[in-house]
From Swiss-Prot:
It catalyses: tRNA(Gly) + glycine + ATP = glycyl-tRNA(Gly) + AMP + diphosphate; 2 ATP + H(+) = P(1),P(4)-bis(5'-adenosyl) tetraphosphate + diphosphate. The gene is GRS2. It comes from the Eukaryota. Keywords: Aminoacyl-tRNA synthetase, ATP-binding, Cytoplasm, Ligase, Nucleotide-binding, Protein biosynthesis, Transferase. Belongs to the class-II aminoacyl-tRNA synthetase family. This is Glycine--tRNA ligase 2.
């Protein structure tokens, strides 16, 4: 599983910038770290990725797409937990003012020290254990590692300040008054949760179902580095699959049962040793309990299929299970789809079981029911604690406040009702808080008792399985995995993009300038447009070899060349990017061959598809 050398990575990133796949934003003003612009080929590749993602997930699973605003009110993200918990730990150089993200600085330093030939075996083992478990470290634990290993500023060796917590959301205000505090969203998921009732209605009240969103999210990175991998504004695609908490099976699980996936479990990581992931089928992983349920397993398998289809190397991918103290505040289990690049393992997809966290907290905060009502085939008895108010005395005592107090009482959990019942039995009264005021209630006003009712409807808050994709990171990993250098010429790099993801499918060029060529160019262009094949005309005066090299750097899989023979017999050459092999045929046959390879996966094999065309000796 060889990785790119630093020189190869420099060559990759030079190619990406030279061919304007991307460039630093506001570059002529000096740029801003963590912000990038996609150029034409980058945009087209991103468009292809989104289209394939929609086909693979939204269309295949009949998902309901939602598109919400990037601006999110403070209350929403306070309720979701992001205001308090969407943080990283950082340290500052008091002399230079430079900030570092603590866990990244530790990783960078310890990896460098592990390369030292004089490091003793015990220190090596300790450092390797830290590196395999650091994602789950708390702030104080990171601080201890910084002190124990005497980690200073990597550039100046200055002693750094103690760690501090930093919230990663961009804060703003909505409206001229500036009184409505808001943030740029850190995820697209909240818009899906808040629209749950509407989505449920569209799905005719039935569970399970899934919604999906594709859009920009924001993260105010402490010290963005590694190019497109760690940025402050990024494109996400998120799925929220709503499921009955008592039944997390999946109707299509048998279709992926035998999908073999590399899994790095929590147990392997906690062993403290550098471990390779274990390859097993998703069926085995679910049956053994390593993966919590069928629905989570189903989406992990589908994610694996998708990533391999778009050009990710199967030997450089794994699912890594979060450690207990690493999981997000909303998750009960989570597996990260990680891709190995020249920068190391990069988290690109998160598959999390969010349980009922989000719907529960938003329902509690707003007083709006976010539940599913399921009609029972057989009614069931339910015994529970209930609170009943004496309407006559309650209304006369509290007047306009009566309904508000009654609403607060109705939201008491079973544990709260038991506690209040005990207080009522012991003291003859209990208190509760309503809008910041203490309200005293006695047995003449309320009764708390056990009550048995016959239920015809089961009402519950659904659980959520969430696959979340960082599309920008995936795009960089495609670049990393698809970049190759010609064996006979180290200066000639090219991208071996799969046909479906390639930004430009065909480039059309001429061997030289000739009065007869423009009409043929026009004919070929019209034929390609008619078949909806994205192409580019290269009519520059440069040599044919340089034209091939330039379009190889754009990852264009096919090249059509018009030459003097074309004028005589209407034949052209068709060149394949990876092998540089060429065949010759009529314009109609060549375009038909390209169309077949692009639009029919079973016909994508070069030898099979070009069987009727004449090989060209180079």
């Amino acid at each position: 599983m060889p990785l790119m050398s630093n020189s190869e990575r420099d060559k990759l990133e030079s190619t990406l910038r030279r061919r304007f796949f991307y460039t630093p934003s506001f570059e002529i003003y000096g740029g801003v770290s963590g912000l990038f612009d996609l150029g034409p080929p980058g945009c087209q590749l991103q468009n292809n990725l989104i289209r394939l993602w929609r086909e693979h997930f939204i269309m295949e699973e009949n998902m309901l797409q939602v598109d919400g605003p990037m601006l999110t009110p403070y209350d929403v993200l306070k309720t979701s937990g992001h205001v308090d918990k969407f943080t990283d730990w950082m340290c500052r150089n008091p002399k230079t003012g430079e900030y570092y993200r603590a866990d990244h600085l530790i990783e960078q330093t310890l990896k460098k020290r592990l390369l030292d030939k004089d490091v003793n075996p015990q220190d090596m083992k300790n450092m390797e254990k830290i590196l395999t478990t650091i994602d789950g470290f708390s702030g104080p634990e990171l601080n201890l590692v910084m002190q124990e290993y005497n980690i200073n500023d990597p550039v100046t060796n200055d002693v750094l300040d103690a760690l501090t917590s930093f919230n990663l959301m961009f804060e703003t205000k909505i409206g001229a008054s500036g009184q409505l505090k808001a943030f740029l969203r850190p995820e697209t998921a909240q818009g899906q949760f808040l629209n749950f009732n509407k989505l449920l209605e569209i799905n005719q009240g039935k569970i399970p179902f899934a919604s999906a969103s594709i859009g920009k999210s924001f993260r105010n990175e402490i010290s963005p580095r590694s190019g497109l991998l760690r940025v402050r504004e990024f494109l996400m695609a998120e799925i929220e699959h709503f499921v009955d908490p008592l039944n997390k099976s999946h109707a299509k699980f048998n279709e992926v049962l035998n999908e073999e996936i590399p899994l790095l479990s929590r147990r392997l990581q906690e062993s403290g040793e550098v471990q390779l992931p274990v390859k097993m089928t998703i069926g085995e992983a679910v049956n053994s309990g390593m993966v919590e349920n069928e629905t989570l397993g189903y989406f992990m398998a589908r994610v694996h299929q998708f990533l391999l289809n778009i050009g990710i190397n199967k030997d450089k991918f794994r699912f890594r299970q979060h450690l207990k103290n690493e999981m997000a505040h909303y998750a009960t289990d989570c597996w990260d789809g990680e891709i190995l690049t020249s920068y190391g393992w990069i988290e690109c997809v998160g598959c999390a079981d969010r349980a009922a966290f989000d719907l529960t907290v938003h329902s509690k905060k707003t007083g709006r029911s976010l539940t599913v009502k399921q009609k029972l085939d057989t009614p069931k008895e339910r015994t529970e604690w209930v609170v009943e108010v004496n309407k006559k005395f309650f209304g006369s005592k509290f007047k306009q406040k009566a309904k508000l107090i009654e609403s607060v009482l109705s939201k008491f959990s079973q544990d709260e009702l038991i506690r209040r019942h005990e207080e009522l039995e012991k003291n003859g009264e209990f208190t509760c808080q309503v809008n910041g005021q203490i309200v005293k209630l006695d047995s003449s006003l309320v009764t708390i008792k056990m009550k048995t009712t016959l239920q015809h409807i089961r009402e519950y808050i659904p659980n959520v399985i969430e696959p979340s994709f960082g599309l920008g990171r995936i795009i960089y990993c495609i670049f990393d995995h698809c970049f190759q250098v010609r064996v006979d010429s180290e200066s000639r790099g090219f991208f071996s993009f799969p046909l479906q993801i390639a930004p430009i499918k065909v480039f059309v060029t001429t061997i030289s300038n000739n009065d007869g060529f423009p009409a043929i160019l026009k004919r070929i262009s019209q034929a390609l447009r008619k078949r909806e094949i994205y192409f580019k005309i290269d009519d520059s005066n440069t040599s044919i070899g340089k034209k091939y090299a330039r379009n190889d750097e754009l990852g264009t899989p096919f090249g059509i060349t018009i030459d003097f023979e074309t004028i005589k017999d209407q034949t052209v050459t068709l060149r394949e990017r990876n092998s540089m092999r060429q065949v010759r045929g009529t314009i109609t046959d060549v375009i038909s061959t390209i169309d077949k390879m692009l639009h029919n996966p079973d016909e994508s094999d070069w030898d099979k598809s070009t069987f009727g065309l004449s090989p060209v000796k180079i």
